[in-house]
């Protein structure tokens, strides 16, 4: 029984950020917020959410080891990707309005909170943003995105073997997925499932004739072939800047945006790779408002969703509107315990808590007390 159980405000106000779950913590890297200064080059920020205490903290800036020498830290960016392999977060790609796109690989040690730039070899992908990254064993797969130097969408697959730090351009077989950016790619078993994103009628070139495909594409990492997939009778609307995650061998997507429909989404869909069918899921409880560019991470049997941007309630739902960046966080519980359901009842009906054990009262307080690290809200146009 899926249920939205927690809704808190006051976290990092971020859009197009990237995040990974490490145990009961979620590490969020970069992104942007309307109204902030992005002309000045600065270090990427790192926020950590504790899924037990339900509190956010922000890591302090990295100080240079040698005075006068800049520390090895990625610059602030958006549209990048992060993956976790063992105790290391690998951050790749993304762009900044001053520096442009980047193709330097950064490694973040979750134990020491130190950054490094591993020495890599092979065919390094061109700098880009809006790509996807997913992991199979020690290998990170990069697909798609918008390449800065070529000034076009990509449908290439690159893989990085982190045991040898070698990049390879994968020579794929079969009919490849269309060029796109701000899609999702999720690894289930040995298969990478690509959904959504923004494509163009003119193939790799951006002409503002956008396409939002809602067919799922599957890449087999063993044969390095794009598979021919059957058509499905029920499909979610095509979208970009949505979230996707795998749980118990199935693929879920949430939210996103379709410019041709002038619509933001807050729907949840489940894809079963065995039957190759989609099903719309209606969780209990109050979920997030329609949005795009948010982050989703799996922590145990829970999904932690935070940030993103939505049209202002005073505006229409078209592509020309004021956007409001979010500092909220929502938790979707796949199997809420009886204890969790009881706490939700206490909150919903404002029941007396004085007779409850101290630890339960502490948990109730955490579930209802907002964080306080977000910036004041600023709306942006576009």
From Swiss-Prot:
Pfam families, sorted: Kelch_6, Kelch_KLHDC2_KLHL20_DRC7
SUPFAM superfamilies: Kelch motif (SSF117281)
Annotated Kelch repeat ranges: 25-77, 88-138, 139-189, 191-249, 251-301
Pathway membership: Protein modification; protein ubiquitination
Molecular function via GO: chromatin binding; ubiquitin-like ligase-substrate adaptor activity
Main location: cytoplasm
UniProt function note: Substrate-recognition component of a Cul2-RING (CRL2) E3 ubiquitin-protein ligase complex of the DesCEND (destruction via C-end degrons) pathway, which recognizes a C-degron located at the extreme C terminus of target proteins, leading to their ubiquitination and degradation. The C-degron recognized by the DesCEND pathway is usually a motif of less than ten residues and can be present in full-length proteins, truncated proteins or proteolytically cleaved forms.
Quaternary context: Component of a CRL2(KLHDC3) complex, also named ECS(KLHDC3) complex, composed of CUL2, Elongin BC (ELOB and ELOC), RBX1 and substrate-specific adapter KLHDC3. May form oligomers as a KLHDC3-ELOB-ELOC complex; this interaction is likely autoinhibitory for the E3 ligase complex.
Name recorded for this polypeptide: Kelch domain-containing protein 3
Organism: Mus musculus (Mouse)
């Amino acid at each position: 029984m899926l249920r939205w159980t927690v809704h808190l405000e006051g976290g990092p106000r971020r859009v197009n950020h990237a995040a990974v779950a490490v145990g009961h913590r979620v590490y969020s890297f970069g992104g942007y917020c309307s109204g902030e200064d992005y002309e000045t080059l600065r270090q990427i920020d790192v926020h950590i959410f504790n899924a037990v205490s339900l509190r956010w903290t922000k890591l302090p800036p990295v100080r240079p080891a040698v005075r006068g020498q800049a520390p090895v830290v990625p610059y602030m960016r958006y549209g990048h990707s992060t993956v976790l392999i063992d105790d290391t977060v690998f951050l790749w790609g993304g762009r900044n309005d001053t520096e442009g796109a980047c193709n330097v690989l950064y490694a973040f040690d979750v134990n020491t909170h130190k950054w490094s730039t591993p020495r890599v070899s092979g065919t390094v992908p061109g700098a880009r943003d809006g790509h996807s990254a997913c992991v199979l064993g020690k290998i990170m797969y990069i697909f798609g995105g918008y390449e800065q130097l070529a000034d076009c969408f990509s449908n290439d697959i690159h893989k990085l073997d982190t045991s040898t730090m070698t990049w390879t351009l994968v020579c794929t077989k079969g009919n490849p997925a269309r060029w796109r950016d701000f899609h999702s790619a999720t690894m289930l078993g040995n298969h990478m499932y690509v959904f959504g994103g923004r494509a163009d009628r003119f193939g790799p070139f951006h002409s503002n004739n956008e396409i939002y495909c809602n067919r799922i594409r599957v890449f087999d990492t063993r044969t390095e072939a794009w598979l021919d997939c059957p058509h499905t009778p029920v499909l979610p609307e095509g979208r970009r800047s949505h979230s996707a995650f795998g749980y118990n061998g199935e693929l879920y997507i949430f939210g996103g945006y379709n410019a041709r429909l002038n619509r933001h989404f807050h729907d949840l869909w489940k894809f079963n790779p065995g039957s190759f069918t989609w099903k719309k899921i209606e969780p209990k409880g109050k979920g997030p408002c329609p949005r795009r560019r948010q982050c989703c991470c799996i922590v145990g049997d829970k999904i932690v969703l935070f940030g993103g941007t939505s049209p202002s309630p005073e505006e229409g739902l078209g592509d020309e509107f004021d956007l409001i960046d979010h500092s909220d966080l929502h938790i979707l519980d796949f199997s809420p315990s009886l204890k969790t359901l009881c706490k939700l009842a206490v909150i919903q009906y404002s029941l007396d808590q004085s007779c409850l054990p101290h630890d339960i009262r502490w948990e109730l307080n955490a579930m209802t007390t907002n964080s306080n690290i977000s910036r004041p809200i600023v709306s942006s146009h576009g």
